[in-house]
A protein has these predicted regions:
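Transmembrane beta-barrel wall of Gram-negative outer-membrane proteins
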Residues: 1-23, 34-69, 85-109, 113, ...
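Surface-exposed extracellular loop regions of Gram-negative outer-membrane beta-barrel proteins
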Residues: 69-71, 117, 184, 257, ...
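Transmembrane beta-barrel strands of outer-membrane/channel proteins
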Residues: 17-23, 61-67, 109-115, 169-175, ...
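Signature of Gram-negative outer-membrane beta-barrel scaffolds
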Residues: 166-264, 275-276, 391-394
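Repeated loop/turn-to-beta-strand initiation elements of outer-membrane beta-barrel proteins
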Residues: 12-15, 56-59, 101-107, 117, ...
Length: 400
């Protein structure tokens, strides 16, 4: 790991650059058999520049690039070889301008670009001796890619009109470019001096999906009395894709009431809409998970979440809490039974179903905040399930 930081212009401009790379692949390489090679590594690079125009105006520039790589190759002899490799990573570039209008109002204006891509490649190669010292080679390879590009503009305001109000509001715009899935296969037959076949097949639609997302929000953290606080908010969003527009109003409300000096109660309700779905092809998180947008056929996911909690601070140096929640979801997206993103020329929209979901849970926590030893201990019990139309996934029965 490397970290460099320092001033560019004294009391005005500074920089910070850090980079790291794992080295397990370099350590393991000498111990691998000659006919099998495995490699895994990751790296990330962060760079920041901060500039102070004045006491009221500051600019923050940042860039990030990270990548994970996995490869496996098998070479039993000179006649047969096969292997695969997987790469996934993110690139983020952003500029944030912070401006203080007065002691009650300040703003943050952010412009950013984000690129996510994963790529899986597999190949097999066979060689045959034809005589006269000539070799015939047959090679097959397949490549699967998925990615997202986002261009984002956001402006946020923080306003304190009085001691009992803390208001936040803002608006934003995102231009999305999705490539949900692109699969390419290539077959070649050749000798040392002649090519008999060199063909590329595009098994899936290579088209991109473009979308525009506009949002605006406002919230007020309101002090009703010395014991009661309310947070009231409303979020508006509009998503336009494939000549189809979706919009949503999403209220949020939370209340915090201090029952006694030691006991505080909290309750909240949140409605949310999500225009980008995560399609998981495996029961654990993998880079093969696809981020796909809503379309004319795929509707936005909507959820309503309710929570209730209590907090106790009656023992010096300790905090105890219990919190429960319930979340109801609509238009949840899952792959149909027996379907994944591999091995089919069918587009992703034809391989998924929309259904319902729910999630419920409770969390207990004890936290020590004073003394030479501090820390926390928590326990969470939760359950989540899905339900699809009869005859669909799991024959319409609920499943985790």
């Amino acid at each position: 790991k490397i970290n460099l930081e320092g001033p560019i212009v004294k009391d005005k401009t500074s920089f910070n650059i850090s980079a790291r790379r794992s080295y397990a692949d370099l350590i393991a390489k000498p111990f691998m058999p000659d006919d099998e090679k495995y490699s895994y590594y990751f790296y990330d690079i962060n760079a920041k520049i901060n500039h102070k125009f004045s006491d009221r105006s500051r600019l923050y520039l940042s860039a990030y690039n990270g990548k994970d790589h996995f490869a496996a190759d098998y070479d039993s002899n000179t006649d047969y070889k096969d292997g695969s490799k997987m790469n996934w990573g993110n690139t983020i570039i952003s500029a944030r301008w912070n401006y203080i209008f007065n002691n009650r109002l300040f703003s943050n204006t952010t412009v950013s670009y984000n690129n996510y891509l994963f790529d899986i490649n597999a190949y097999t190669s066979n060689q045959y001796a034809l005589g006269n010292d000539e070799t015939f080679t047959n090679r097959y390879s397949s490549d699967y890619r998925s990615g997202i590009n986002d261009w984002n503009y956001q402006i946020d305001f923080d306003y304190n009109p009085s001691p009992v109000h803390h208001v936040k509001f803002g608006t934003g715009y995102i231009y999305h470019r999705f490539r949900p899935e692109v699969m390419t296969s290539k077959i070649s037959d050749r000798t040392d001096d002649q090519t008999y076949r060199d063909t590329t097949y595009h098994n899936m639609n290579n088209s991109r999906i473009y979308a525009h997302e506009v949002s605006a929000y406002a919230e007020d953290n309101l002090k009703i009395s010395s014991r009661l606080r309310l947070n009231l908010g409303l979020h508006f969003s509009l998503f336009h894709v494939q000549k189809q527009s979706y919009f949503s109003l999403q209220p949020r409300i939370s209340a915090r009431y201090q029952l006694t000096d030691d006991i505080t109660l909290k309750a909240s309700y949140t409605k949310m809409s999500q225009y980008v779905h995560l399609l998981s092809s495996m029961p654990i998180a993998m880079p093969t998970d696809l981020w796909v947008p809503v379309t004319k056929e795929i509707k936005p996911m909507q959820s309503h979440q309710y929570s209730l909690g209590g907090y106790y601070t009656g023992i010096k140096g300790w905090e105890f809490s219990v919190e429960g929640y319930y979340k109801d979801m609509r238009n949840v997206l899952e792959y149909k039974d027996g379907v994944s993103f591999f091995g089919s020329s069918t587009g992703w929209e034809n391989k998924v179903e929309m259904g319902k979901g729910r999630s419920v849970g409770i969390e207990l926590m004890a936290q020590k905040t004073l003394g030479k030893t501090t820390g926390w201990l928590s326990y969470t019990l939760s359950k989540s399930d899905r339900k699809f139309a009869k005859g669909g996934i799991n024959n319409g029965e609920r499943f985790p």
